[in-house]
Curated annotation (Swiss-Prot):
Localization annotation: Cytoplasm
The protein's Enzyme Commission number: 2.5.1.55
Name of the gene encoding the protein in the UniProt record: kdsA
Pathway: Carbohydrate biosynthesis; 3-deoxy-D-manno-octulosonate biosynthesis; 3-deoxy-D-manno-octulosonate from D-ribulose 5-phosphate: step 2/3; Bacterial outer membrane biogenesis; lipopolysaccharide biosynthesis
Protein known as: 2-dehydro-3-deoxyphosphooctonate aldolase
Source organism per UniProt: Koribacter versatilis (strain Ellin345)
Keyword Electron transport part of the UniProt annotation: no
GO biological process, one term: keto-3-deoxy-D-manno-octulosonic acid biosynthetic process
Length: 278
C-alpha cells in the first residue's frame, strides 16, 4: 500500500488525479509564464491539482545544434518566478549531482531523466535535497526493476518518490507502452503516465534533420488507457504552437486541446474510482 504525500497543495498518490504539464524546454521567460498561466487556468477551472514543468537544459538532444534551453542559473530564476507569480509547484529535470543540489534550492520536484534512472549518485543527491523525486522509467528498464531506484531514494532518507512511465523501446526509433507496467510500478510508489514522450519516435528524423518525431494523435487514447489502469497523475508536454516549439514539438499536445483531453480523463477517473466507504 503506497503512502500519499504532498507537493505544496498537490497530493501525490491520493484520490484526485493530478497533472504535470508545461513546455518541453524553457524557450523564454515570457513563454514559460504564458504557458504556466494558461495551463493553471484550465486546471483551476476543472479543479485538477497542477504542477508546472519545464527544462532549463535538454542535455540529450539528437543534434549538437538543437536548442537546449537557457541553462541552469537563468532557468532556475525563471522557474522561481513561475512558482512565485503563478503560485504553482514546479518540476524540472537534473542531470548530475551538482545540478540536483542547485535545483533543489528552487524547485519542488526534481525529475530524474529516463536515460539516467539507474545513476545511483544522481538518485542519492536528488533524494538528499528533501524535495520530491520523480524517476522516469528508462526505455530499457523492466517495470519491476524500478523498485531499486525507489529503494535508493528512500534509503537516502527521502520517502517522497514517484515513478513515471514513458514507454519502452520497440525496435528502432519507436516506443510502445505496456500498460502492465503501471500496476507493477504502483506496488512501489505513486505512478505517473507521460502521455507525450510515450508517443515520441526517438531520433526518427524529418526531412534529413536529426530530430525526434512523434505521433501526438495517440496522446488522448493512451492517456485514457493509463487513467483507466489507475495512474495517480498524468504528465504532458503542452505547447501553444507545437510546430514551432524549440524542443519535442512533434510529440507535444496543443494547448487548445488540453481541456478536452482532461475532461475525458476526469470522467474515466470517476468511473474507475471505488465509492467512498460510508
Amino acid at each position: 500500500m503506497i503512502e500519499p504525500f504532498k507537493v505544496k497543495d498537490v497530493e501525490i498518490g491520493g484520490p484526485k488525479l493530478f497533472l504535470i504539464a508545461g513546455p518541453c524546454v524553457i524557450e523564454s521567460e515570457a513563454h514559460a509564464m504564458k504557458m504556466a498561466e494558461a495551463i493553471s487556468g484550465v486546471c483551476k477551472a476543472m479543479k485538477i491539482p497542477y504542477i508546472f514543468k519545464a527544462s532549463y537544459d535538454k542535455a540529450n538532444r539528437t543534434s549538437l545544434s538543437s536548442f537546449r534551453g537557457p541553462g541552469l542559473h537563468e532557468g532556475l530564476r525563471i522557474l522561481a518566478k513561475v512558482a512565485d507569480e503563478v503560485n504553482v509547484p514546479v518540476l524540472t529535470d537534473v542531470h548530475d549531482t551538482e545540478q540536483a543540489t542547485a535545483a533543489g534550492d528552487i524547485v519542488d520536484v526534481l525529475q530524474i531523466p529516463a536515460f539516467l534512472c539507474r545513476q545511483t549518485d544522481l538518485l542519492v543527491a536528488a533524494a538528499k535535497t528533501g524535495k520530491v523525486v520523480n524517476v522516469k522509467k528508462g526505455q530499457f528498464v523492466a517495470p519491476n526493476d524500478m523498485q531499486y531506484a525507489v529503494t535508493k531514494v528512500r534509503e537516502s532518507g527521502n520517502q517522497r518518490v514517484c515513478l513515471t512511465e514513458r514507454g519502452a523501446s520497440f525496435g528502432y526509433n519507436n516506443l510502445v507502452v505496456d500498460m502492465r507496467a503501471l500496476p507493477i510500478m504502483r506496488q512501489f510508489a505513486p505512478v505517473i503516465f507521460d502521455a507525450t514522450h510515450s508517443v515520441q519516435l526517438p531520433s526518427a528524423g524529418k526531412d534529413g534533420h536529426a530530430v525526434s518525431g512523434g505521433q501526438p494523435e495517440f496522446i488522448p487514447v493512451l492517456s485514457r488507457a493509463a487513467v483507466a489502469a489507475g495512474v495517480d497523475g498524468v504528465f504532458m508536454e503542452v505547447h501553444d504552437d507545437p510546430p514551432h516549439a524549440k524542443s519535442d514539438g512533434a510529440n507535444a499536445l496543443d494547448l487548445k486541446l488540453l481541456r478536452g483531453v482532461l475532461t475525458s480523463l476526469l470522467r474515466i477517473r470517476e468511473a474507475v474510482t471505488p465509492p467512498a466507504a460510508s
